[in-house]
């Protein structure tokens, strides 16, 4: 038997389900850092198997539960799977056996193969597999090695005793001593009882003679008592007959009054119901009135608010209209002024451009001519400047190249500016087109906005009409709901009354069957319960309709059968009953299975106009004919139980009157007053009527709700359309503002683009003139190349200079004229442009925005909406006022009806008081009769008291007879209601019957009487009988202490003596057996201790030799000297302890034998391990758990321990924890424990990973 798998959940540091599987059947090692949870893994196994965790208190169980962040763990569970292939667990045939222990705050449970078992069964199972409770060393925890290594010799002896199993012997010895003590106590008691019985037998022998004389007197006394009881019986019968006659007479009178009173009370109940309904109607009318008044008040407030808003909007529109007209007038003037200035500007601009061009041309020509003159004059100094013609030409070519570069640059600039001007023209045209497009869009948007505004007003009117229709439908729905509430109250009241008059089990049964049918309907998948659902028809009372006048008679005959359940077959009844019991429902249910019901044959009724078969007065469907005829078979209904009814009874019919009086064909007549207010059929009829009314009202409510939904949806649709229109209008407004803003922005951009054209044209003109200068200069340089150099100008050159200077002077004069004219035009042009751009254009934009502002449209739209709302509000106010007038009128009608109803109630109350006065008169008569009854009762009880006193004077018979004497009620006591008085008379008659029965009982208690009792004492007067009874009593006083059971007691005592004698012998035999068992147990204990010591001693020498090959060890038993007073005791009792002597061969060859106290810590641990291995070999277990047993050993000894475990693993499984690498070398399976986030995790690892664990722990240790 080996550990195959361990599952840990919620135990200490293990939170989630931790599965440790794949254990080797030989050697397994668990490694991990200190505090990671290795020991908790061992504790989990101990938790299941060890006695250390056997009995845990609540706080100890809670201490085992995992504690960390996150949800709290509810329980700790450890499951160990054992390999049972060797069948060491013989009680199980499976190859695997699972043992589970689970603890929580309240529970501690064990399971074997998922079956809950007590702990004792788990313990017995482990013992059967080879685990001894006397040898706890198959689990060695941390510290156990050190504890054993440092323990004294006496502790080792105690350990040896446990291993030998002496605790079992001691427990059995203790149990045997306890049984022996109890046996001796029982023997002493039996001896005392025997002594008492002997004395009692002697006393009973003397009491026999007194008993005979006593029995003679007792017979005479009982004969006299019987005669007195017989006389009392006859008097009671006479009194009962008289009282019965009085009771019948009073009942007849009272029943008539009560019947009238019931009619009055029923009328009062009807009136109260009508009043209740009327009050409910009144509450509804008042609520409607208050609601309509509140609506009217609210509408008046809305009307005032709307009028104020309309007035305010009218004033704003007037102001805005005047402002707009002023803006339009101003816009016209500004437009004319702009037109005039633009016209003038258009006239100035061409002339200004022409002058500007002329001015620029003249300036350029002047510069060209001046430059030409300077160049000609410069030829005079060429000889001083240049050394040769080539130098000059070289200079000129360089200048030509420079000028050519400038020409190219200026041409490029010219092209760029021309391109920019073309772009500006295009942008100008584009912006102008956009302005025109936006203007058209603004006009279209304004048109759409006006159109939607008109539609919005129309939708508002539609919404008002829909709203009024919705409110009307809602009021109709509320009225129907009020009616439903009243009807449900009526049904609830009928159910409450029916619950009070129907027996609780029957009513619970009806409710339970309804739940069962609903359950069948709920679970009716694929029609599997259709037979039950369709085969259950309801209760009898639900299937019948009975006219009012016959309901009492039918109810008297049917009784609880009215609530029997009618089903198609008995199989369906069985299914319903089975489901009823499965659901554990309370109550009583009875069935009429139609396939089992058989109706008796209905005999023909002779001609009798006043009699009808009961089956003829009940209305039901034909399919239920057998059910109703089985209830009403051969039952005839008549008006009264007259002679005709007696004739029908003689013909074999059961007869019942319409008032409920019955006459059975067997001769039994029953009847009396029946409270029709408690009629089950009447209540059920009312409930059925109310239920039908409720169904109709609910149908009407569904239609009303549908109408409300439709009206609400219609109003909601219109409101949504209104909202959409409002949103659309808002979008139009927003779009208008956006378009206006866009138009203004583009206009600004247009003005900015336009303003850039003139500078660019001026710049272009300057570039062109500069090009002319450069071209002229280049041409001059080109002409000069190759010419001769001279110090003087030629005549042509001089003439050219003169012409050029003259031309320059003329052009200068012309330039002055042109410049002056251009400056004048420029000033005028700038003034006009400034006026237009800085004032007139902005004023026009402002006025245009004012004219085009849609706020007027918005206000107009608001005004139209407000006017439409006011119109709608006035319409709704008119409708509300009409409804309010109607409600006030209806409320006045209600108040009139309420007054009339109150008058009727007062009249009925007066009738009720008159009838109650008649009942009070009857009550006086009942009081007189009751007083007379009390007198008769008192006389009779006085005579009984005398008789009882005479009988109780004999103490020996005080337990043989008993009388129940009631205290007389005071005559003229507090007057009770008439119903209580009637009940009291009936009770009085019942008491007389009870008294008669008591007399008969007492006469029977007298036992067998002498044969002459009737003839001897029958004619004796009562006084003489009392005198004779008193004489007998006085004579019996002499024997008041006589033992009437002396003979029986003598026989019983003799039998008891014989039985006690036998038991005495058995107890003696038991004492001898127990003493013999104690001796055997003591001897076996001593033998077990000796045998165990020898085995452990031998094993220790072998194990120590294996662990320390060059050393030796032995164990010795130490015993104290025997004292003189201990002669005869076993030598084992003299043992004081076990000493251990070992020798280790040191490096210097020292092999001295030493005791445990002389060894080092590591040597002590090794010796302790040798002792444990020796004990385990003496009492081997299937597996062992070692927790860090090598902690204190050096490397050599750890290697020896590892080899020892490897050799022992052939016969047993080992699971060890360690911090050292030696145990890893010989192990077959390795497990690593990690601790993350306060939770331990254990996984299977390789040998190399296990070495890493050990090295990591050594590094961090």
Curated annotation (Swiss-Prot):
Keyword set, alphabetical order: Cell cycle, Cell division, Chromosome, Coiled coil, DNA damage, DNA repair, Mitosis, Nucleus
PANTHER family membership: STRUCTURAL MAINTENANCE OF CHROMOSOMES PROTEIN 3
InterPro entries: P-loop_NTPase (IPR027417), RecF/RecN/SMC_N (IPR003395), SMC (IPR024704), SMC3_ABC_euk (IPR041741), SMC_hinge (IPR010935), SMC_hinge_sf (IPR036277)
The protein's name in its UniProt record: Structural maintenance of chromosomes protein 3
Every SMC hinge domain range: 534-645
GO process annotations (BP): cell division; DNA repair; establishment of mitotic sister chromatid cohesion; mitotic sister chromatid cohesion
UniProt record similarity statement: Belongs to the SMC family. SMC3 subfamily.
SMART domains: SMC_hinge
CDD domains: ABC_SMC3_euk
Disruption phenotype: RNAi-mediated knock-down is embryonic lethal and results in aberrant chromosome segregation during mitosis. RNAi-mediated knockdown at 20 degrees Celsius results in the mis-localization of lab-1 in germ line nuclei.
Source organism of the structure: Caenorhabditis elegans
Molecular function GO labels: ATP binding; ATP hydrolysis activity; double-stranded DNA binding
């Amino acid at each position: 038997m080996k550990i195959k798998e361990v599952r840990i959940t919620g135990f200490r540091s293990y939170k989630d389900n931790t599965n440790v599987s794949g254990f080797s059947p030989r050697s397994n090692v668990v490694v991990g850092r200190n505090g990671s949870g290795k020991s908790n893994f061992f504790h989990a196994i101990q938790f299941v198997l060890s006695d250390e965790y056997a009995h845990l208190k609540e706080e100890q169980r809670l201490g085992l539960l995992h504690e960390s962040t996150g949800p709290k763990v509810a329980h700790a569970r450890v499951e160990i799977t054992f390999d049972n292939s060797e069948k060491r667990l013989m009680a199980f045939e499976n190859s695997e056996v699972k043992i589970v222990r689970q603890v929580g705050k309240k529970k501690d449970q064990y399971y074997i193969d998922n079956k809950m078992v007590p702990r004792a069964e788990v313990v017995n199972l482990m013992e059967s597999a080879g685990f001894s409770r006397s040898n706890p060393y198959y689990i060695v925890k941390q510290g156990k090695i050190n504890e054993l290594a440092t323990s004294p010799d006496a502790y080792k002896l105690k350990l040896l005793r446990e291993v030998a199993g002496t605790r079992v012997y001691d427990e059995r010895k203790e149990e045997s001593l306890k049984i022996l003590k109890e046996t001796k106590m029982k023997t002493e008691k039996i001896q005392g009882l025997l002594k008492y019985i002997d004395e009692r037998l002697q006393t009973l022998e003397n009491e026999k003679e007194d008993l005979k004389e006593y029995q003679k007197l007792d017979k005479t006394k009982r004969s006299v008592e019987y005669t007195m009881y017989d006389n009392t019986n006859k008097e009671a019968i006479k009194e009962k007959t008289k009282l019965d006659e009085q009771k019948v007479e009073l009942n007849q009178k009272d029943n008539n009054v009560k019947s009238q009173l019931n009619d009055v009370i029923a009328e009062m109940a009807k009136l109260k119901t009508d009043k209740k309904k009327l009050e409910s109607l009144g509450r509804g009318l008042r609520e409607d009135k208050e609601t309509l008044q509140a609506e009217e008040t609210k509408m008046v407030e809305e009307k005032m608010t709307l009028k104020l808003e309309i007035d305010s909007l009218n004033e704003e529109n007037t102001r805005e209209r005047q402002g707009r007209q002023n803006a339009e007038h101003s816009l016209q003037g500004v437009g004319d002024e702009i037109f005039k200035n633009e016209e003038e500007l258009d006239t100035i601009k061409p002339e200004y451009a022409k002058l500007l061009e002329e001015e620029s041309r003249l300036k350029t020509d002047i510069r060209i001519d001046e430059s030409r003159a300077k160049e000609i004059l410069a030829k005079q100094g060429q000889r001083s400047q240049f050394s040769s013609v080539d130098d000059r030409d070289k200079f000129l070519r360089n200048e030509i190249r420079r000028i050519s570069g400038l020409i190219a640059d200026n041409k490029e600039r010219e092209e760029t500016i021309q391109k920019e001007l073309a772009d500006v023209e295009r942008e100008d045209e584009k912006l102008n087109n956009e302005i025109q497009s936006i203007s058209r869009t603004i006009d279209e948007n304004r048109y759409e906005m006006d159109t939607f505004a008109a539609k919005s007003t129309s939708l508002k009117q539609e919404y008002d009409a829909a709203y009024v229709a919705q409110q009307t439908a809602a009021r109709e729905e509320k009225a129907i709901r009020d009616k439903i509430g009243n009807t449900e109250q009526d049904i609830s009241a009928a159910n409450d009354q029916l619950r009070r008059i129907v027996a609780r089990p029957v009513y619970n049964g009806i409710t339970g069957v309804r739940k069962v049918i609903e359950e069948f309907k709920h679970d009716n998948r694929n029609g599997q319960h259709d037979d039950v659902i369709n085969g259950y028809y309801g209760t009898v009372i639900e299937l019948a309709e009975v006219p009012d006048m016959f309901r009492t008679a039918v109810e008297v005959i049917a009784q609880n059968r009215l609530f029997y359940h009618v089903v198609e077959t008995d199989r369906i009844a069985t299914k319903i009953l089975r489901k009823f019991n499965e659901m554990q429902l309370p109550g009583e249910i009875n069935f009429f299975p139609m396939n089992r019901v058989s109706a008796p044959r209905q005999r023909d009724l002779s001609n009798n106009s006043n009699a009808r078969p009961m089956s003829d007065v009940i209305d039901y469907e034909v399919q239920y004919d057998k059910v109703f005829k089985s209830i009403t078979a051969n039952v005839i209904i008549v008006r009264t139980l007259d002679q005709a009814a007696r004739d029908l009874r003689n013909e074999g019919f059961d007869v019942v009157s319409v008032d409920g009086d019955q006459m059975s064909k067997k001769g039994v007549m029953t009847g009396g007053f029946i409270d029709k207010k408690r009629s089950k059929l009447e209540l059920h009829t009312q409930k059925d009527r109310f239920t039908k009314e409720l169904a109709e009202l609910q149908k009407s409510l569904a239609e009303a709700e549908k109408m409300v939904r439709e009206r609400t949806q219609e109003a909601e649709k219109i409101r949504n359309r209104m909202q959409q229109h409002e949103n659309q209008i808002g979008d139009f407004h927003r779009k208008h503002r956006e378009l206006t803003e866009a138009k203004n922005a583009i206009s600004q951009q247009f003005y900015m683009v336009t303003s850039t054209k003139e500078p660019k044209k001026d710049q272009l003109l300057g570039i062109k003139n500069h090009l002319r200068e450069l071209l002229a200069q280049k041409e001059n340089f080109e002409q000069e190349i190759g010419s001769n150099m001279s110090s003087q100008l030629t005549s042509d050159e001089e003439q050219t200079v003169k012409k050029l200077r003259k031309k320059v002077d003329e052009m200068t004069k012309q330039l002055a004229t042109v410049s002056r004219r251009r400056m004048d035009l420029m000033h005028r042009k700038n003034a006009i442009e400034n006026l237009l751009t800085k004032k007139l254009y902005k004023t026009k934009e402002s006025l245009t925005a004012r004219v085009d502002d849609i706020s007027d449209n918005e206000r107009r739209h608001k005004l139209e909406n407000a006017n439409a709302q006011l119109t709608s509000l006035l319409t709704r106010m008119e409708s509300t006022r009409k409804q309010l007038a109607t409600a006030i009128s209806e409320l006045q009608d209600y108040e009139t009806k309420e007054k009339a109803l109150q008058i009727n109630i007062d009249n009925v109350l007066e009738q009720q008081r008159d009838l109650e006065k008649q009942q009070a008169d009857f009550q006086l008569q009942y009081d007189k009769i009751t007083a007379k009854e009390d007198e008769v009762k008192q006389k009779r009880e006085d005579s009984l008291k005398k008789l009882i006193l005479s009988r109780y004077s004999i103490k020996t018979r005080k337990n043989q007879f008993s009388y129940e004497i009631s205290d007389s009620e005071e005559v003229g006591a507090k007057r009770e209601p008439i119903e209580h008085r009637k009940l009291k008379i009936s009770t009085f008659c019942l008491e007389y019957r009870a008294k008669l029965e008591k007399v008969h009982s007492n006469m029977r208690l007298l036992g067998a009487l002498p044969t002459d009792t009737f003839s001897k004492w029958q004619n004796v007067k009562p006084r003489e009988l009392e005198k004779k009874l008193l004489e007998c009593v006085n004579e019996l006083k002499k024997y008041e202490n006589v033992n009437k059971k002396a003979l029986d007691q003598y026989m019983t005592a003799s039998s008891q003596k014989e039985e006690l004698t036998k038991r005495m012998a058995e107890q003696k035999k038991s004492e001898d057996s127990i003493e013999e068992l104690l001796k055997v147990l003591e001897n076996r204990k001593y033998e077990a201790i000796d045998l165990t010591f020898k085995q452990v001693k031998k094993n220790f020498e072998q194990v120590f030799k294996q662990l320390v090959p060059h050393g030796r060890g032995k164990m010795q038993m130490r015993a104290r000297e025997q004292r003189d007073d201990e002669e005869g005791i076993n030598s084992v009792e003299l043992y004081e302890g076990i000493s251990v002597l070992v020798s280790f061969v040191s490096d210097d060859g020292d092999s001295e034998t030493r005791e445990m106290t002389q060894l080092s810590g590591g040597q002590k641990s090794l010796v302790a391990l040798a002792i444990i291995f020796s004990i385990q070999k003496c009492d081997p277990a299937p597996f062992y758990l070692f927790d860090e047993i090598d902690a204190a050993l050096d490397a050599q000894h750890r290697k020896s321990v590892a080899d020892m475990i490897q050799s022992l693993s052939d016969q047993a499984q080992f699971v060890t924890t360690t911090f050292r690498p030696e145990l890893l070398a010989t192990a077959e399976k390795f497990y690593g424990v990690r601790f993350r986030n306060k939770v331990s995790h254990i996984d299977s690892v390789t040998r190399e990973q296990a070495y890493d664990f050990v090295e990591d722990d050594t590094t961090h240790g």
